[in-house]
UniProtKB/Swiss-Prot annotation:
Residue list for modification N6-(pyridoxal phosphate)lysine: K226
GO molecular function terms noted in the UniProt entry: cysteine desulfurase activity; pyridoxal phosphate binding; selenocysteine lyase activity
Keywords, alphabetical: Cytoplasm, Lyase, Pyridoxal phosphate, Transferase
Active site, per annotation: C364
Cofactor: pyridoxal 5'-phosphate
Location of the protein in the cell: Cytoplasm
One annotated Gene Ontology cellular component of this protein: cytoplasm
Catalytic function, reaction form: (sulfur carrier)-H + L-cysteine = (sulfur carrier)-SH + L-alanine; L-selenocysteine + AH2 = hydrogenselenide + L-alanine + A + H(+)
GO BP annotation list: cysteine metabolic process
The species this protein was found in: Salmonella agona (strain SL483)
Protein name in the entry: Cysteine desulfurase
Entry similarity comment: Belongs to the class-V pyridoxal-phosphate-dependent aminotransferase family. Csd subfamily.
Subunit structure: Homodimer. Interacts with SufE and the SufBCD complex composed of SufB, SufC and SufD. The interaction with SufE is required to mediate the direct transfer of the sulfur atom from the S-sulfanylcysteine.
TM annotation in the entry: none
Length: 406
């Protein structure tokens, strides 16, 4: 069955607009995906007809809002096949989720002389929190190097583990290269050394189904805004036994059981003790609508369509004169490239003149840029609403830029 891309595009109002007098070709979904009417309408309806502060409210609106929020927690747990909804913490996004783990689990479990393993392709959100933790604790940060094609040098991984390795923190899919890492093998190796595993799933959950139980990771985190949902909301999954042992890292309302000026404070049970303050309930409602939306289309069908489009894009872009493509042949979601010796910002500016939106810069992956010896790259990302015609426009635009700039 053909993927209904035109029907999908009709659900995204922003795709009907023009930029610089030309139809928008939005090739920047890896930075943040556009939102369908179903998400926009769900969040709007909540604020128009159902808004109230959640937790402890005895009135109807509060009770309904609380129920709606907790239903999304259950929905998200099914989406990633968690064992229980109580293994999921609502966070602002992937960055906050990783910082929560570093500041809660990491503070309790990392000691001087321990080590944490990451890779050279990580987003800053999966580098900087571990650097900060290691500096604070006197621990070591070890790095899995890359092959030239943008895949991990897995033959070096076993040597990085030892009896002081406490955590492997690894991206599921690179936000720059599109590399999908072989998590089952990596997690199995971590288990041999008694290490925990955190997976940054920000660039994975929109492209194919994720099963955290099958992966057997300890932590999995992703953002709503890359999954066609609102900004400011994400999910942190933690295995239940581990989550119940973790202390809170932020204090305030909603995360406590009792507060006394003389007896101190006791915490709510997990996951609620990690959700201090008033939550982004509207964002949570929107996230639920986004999960409904991609589930209704079928992640397998979305993935098949995107892979077909990716193959076409790589074939066509390879014909552009003087282009350098980064990353493996088999990839998800993104194509990073440079055009001759021209700075990525210049190329991106020209493309914007043609109504084509790509991302330019270091993509929050400065160590990866340093490894490739470039200050920046252009990145085109492909989502379920992109088309062959938009790929053709990108190729034509780059060919024209090469002709103009030489």
């Amino acid at each position: 069955m053909t993927f209904p891309v035109e029907k999908v595009r009709a659900d995204f109002p922003i795709l009907q607009r023009e930029v610089n007098g030309l139809p928008l070709a939005y090739l920047d979904s890896a930075a943040s995906a556009q939102k369908p009417n179903q998400v926009i309408d769900a969040e709007s309806a909540f604020y128009r007809h159902g808004y109230a502060a959640v937790h402890r409210g005895i009135h109807t609106l509060s009770a309904q809002a609380t129920e709606s929020m907790e239903n999304v927690r259950k929905q998200a747990s099914r989406f990633i096949n968690a064992r229980s909804a109580e293994e999921l913490v609502f966070v602002r996004g992937t960055t906050e989720g990783i910082n929560l783990v570093a500041n809660s689990w990491g503070t309790e479990n990392i000691r001087a002389g321990d080590n944490i393993i990451i890779s050279e392709m990580e987003h800053h959100a999966n580098i900087v929190p571990w650097q900060m933790l290691c500096e604070r604790k006197g621990a070591e940060l070890r790095v899995i190097p890359l092959h030239p094609d943008g895949t991990l040098r897995l033959e070096t991984l076993a040597a990085l583990f030892d009896d002081r390795t406490r955590l492997l923190a690894i991206t599921h899919v690179s936000n720059v290269l599109g590399t999908e890492n072989p998590l089952p093998d990596m997690i199995a190796l971590a288990r041999q050394h008694g290490a925990k595993v955190l997976v940054d799933g920000a660039q994975a959950v929109m492209h194919h189904a994720v099963d955290v139980q099958a992966l057997d990771c300890d932590f999995y985190v992703f953002s709503g805004h890359k999954l066609y949902g609102p900004t400011g909301i994400g999910i942190l999954y933690v295995k239940e036994a581990l989550l119940q042992e973790m202390p809170p890292w932020e204090g305030g309302g909603s995360m406590i059981s009792t507060v006394s000026l003389t007896q101190g404070t006791t915490w709510a049970k997990a996951p609620w003790r990690f959700e201090a303050g008033t939550p982004n309930t509207g964002g949570i409602i929107g996230l639920g609508a986004a999960i409904d939306y991609v589930t209704s289309l079928g992640l397998d069908k979305i993935g098949d369509y995107e892979q077909m489009l990716m193959r076409y894009a790589l074939e066509q872009l390879a014909q552009v004169p003087d282009i350098t493509l980064y990353g493996p042949a088999q990839r998800l979601g993104v194509i990073a490239f440079n055009l001759g010796n021209h700075h990525a910002y210049d190329v991106g500016s020209f493309l914007d003149n043609y109504g084509i939106a790509v991302r330019t810069g270091h993509h929050c992956a400065m160590p990866l840029m340093a490894w490739y010896g470039v200050p920046a790259m252009c990145r085109a990302s492909l989502a379920m609403y992109n088309t062959h015609e938009e790929v053709d426009r990108l190729v034509a635009g780059l060919t024209r830029i090469h002709r103009l700039l030489g």
